[in-house]
Amino acid sequence: MYRFCAHAYLLLKYEKYHNQNQQLKKLWASFRCLFRLAAFALPRRYQSFFEAELILKNSTLETRLTLYRRLRSRLRLKNKNYTRSSSIMFNIQTTFPPHGEMKTFIVLREVDLLLLSLEFMNVSLARADLLVRNLHYFAIHSTLVMLHQYEYIYLMLTSGFCRYLGVCFFMIIQKYVTPGVMLGRWKVTA
């Protein structure tokens, strides 16, 4: 599953599907199906990430904040002896597109990406501290890639660090800007 997603991401990354709407729809359907199946196939320690995904899909701010606090509390309990765990948080941003409809999406900070990956992989606290202090070596970036307006797409956050741990991260991002615009940058390893 992850191998397929990595391949699909690379195709999207190099804009092969930008002008092929039919193929993009098929690719999106594949991502959606894989993500739904993964939620049932992964061990329990991975479920926190799928709760984070639910924050995006809930319509009310109150529900999103409730799920967010539950996820943050779980991560704090798991890393209760690690001082940086208290800084884990999702940056929930609300934007207003030209047509006035409110859109909400989540941007993960670099430290959050690192700590979440450590939580998923059960890395020891000593190792976690070492990786946090050397964060800049791994070049983890929170990136929004805009392919088409007002559509959802699952993106794999790829970096040298994620490849090192063998972890694939997915985010749902609701786009509201001009298609093809890239914010931030991706570091894709071979």
Swiss-Prot record:
Membrane topology reported for the UniProt record: Single-pass membrane protein
The entry's keywords: Membrane, Transmembrane, Transmembrane helix
Gene Ontology process terms (BP): protein targeting to vacuole
Cell location: Membrane
Consequence of gene loss (knockout): Deletion causes a vacuolar protein sorting defect.
Further remark: Partially overlaps RGP1. Disruption phenotypes caused by deletion of this gene may also be a result of a defect in its overlapping gene.
Protein name as catalogued: Putative uncharacterized protein VPS61
Main localization (coarse): membrane
Transmembrane segments: 152-174
